[in-house]
């Protein structure tokens, strides 16, 4: 079956122009067929058939896939292919004309994108140069010291390091804002390519373009936006083709692999993508290429980490975070096989009287200090904490499931609460006042740790990146955030729409919607299973959940 692409005139016209310039007389027209009939009457039936085969082959090669709607048709228009010299003569003007037609065909979405860009400009004007979170200082320190972090993998510091010569936190904010816009464009482009009208392709892109929590993460020195961007663009590229070309498979694999070293929750996603592609019946060789490409950044980073700490890992804190996960329910009295050296991590308080899981990582009173003193992320402490957590899950599987389901309940709740337990607070809202960088105690650790000439002062400038609130832009964003955000319940509905589309296509293993939906579901479930709940973790699932719903 040959699909006819009527939704992407820019790509279609550019393909026509390139074919005009390079194909010459490769695709036969009526004149060529007539000449063949005059020279060789016996070939009158053969020449048109050969021309059709050449045309079909050319379409397939240009599409980069087998049987995919990859530009094989041209909107039902006849495709004349004049000689190469004639095509080259008017190429520049025709490129401009074709691009203009393409933009005109998508003007409605262009208006939406313009509003989204303007909104991000308001954020940048209202909070200059960028906003900070407690993790932000560590990312800056890692960027200037070139040492793998034990707590957080260094994929985001690599990004900051690439921008270090420009010494501009405003540029960091601008690039992250651009990533947010491009994610919305990617969702729209894939859905238009798959046949949705402009409004049907625009709706799934709206949460990415206008959700206030997305806007704030884009304006913070945090790894989340880079992680979401890499995963979203990689999956969108894989949904662009039925059979992704080798080049696309390599690029998508590298992006997914790099996302795993930006945030370690992305490590299982490579396996999720591979399984989803195989179920979608993508050529196994192309899936293998994607897998190998995805392993390159992961294995390379693990080797680099090993050169510093003597172990092959992405970080040294997975056991500690899993311990914080089980801290809300673990009771040593219900763990009869607990080793004596692990009992030091028991909390005698009843589960309903315990603090948030974050306290078991960062507080000075965490039981982890009994093992390692002030360094709760030492190799020994992480190993002991991880073993305790595994024993707790094995001994109390029902309690563990209840804890995970409770956090999932926060994910899909209608209202967002401001409490330490649910991981939502002033840090993830636009405020009328922001804490100056110089008043944050963590800064002193950064200044001590970053001893080389590219310290925080050099990266952020003389003001150390101290944020400034500017009116009336900040007031606009404070009012905006009260209305324009994606409620958790609506995210649940979006996931259900994607699931319904997959079930309806069960004979084809869910079709194209399976891949983005599976990755989105994994991003919703993995954080509550391995660490705890935070609203910023949920945002990673939104773009792909919307893409899956659109494809469904």
Question: Whereabouts are the PLM-identified features?
Answer:
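Multi-pass, polyprenyl lipid-linked donor-dependent membrane glycosyltransferases
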Residues: 134, 171-181, 203-238, 246-247, ...
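Membrane-interface transmembrane helices that cradle and orient dolichyl/undecaprenyl
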Residues: 193-195, 234-249, 277, 281
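Start-transfer (signal-anchor) and selected internal transmembrane alpha helices
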Residues: 1-120, 512, 552
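Transmembrane alpha-helices of multi-pass, membrane-embedded glycan-processing enzymes
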Residues: 160-167, 172-186, 227-230, 487-498, ...
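Transmembrane signal-anchor helices characteristic of membrane glycosylation enzymes that use polyprenol
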Residues: 104-131, 210, 294-305
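Extracytoplasmic catalytic/substrate-binding loops of multi-pass membrane glycan-assembly enzymes
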Residues: 126-139, 147-167, 314-315, 381, ...
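Membrane-interface alpha helices of multi-pass inner-membrane proteins
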Residues: 117, 205, 249-263, 274, ...
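Membrane-proximal stem/loop segments at transmembrane-domain junctions that anchor or position
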Residues: 315-462
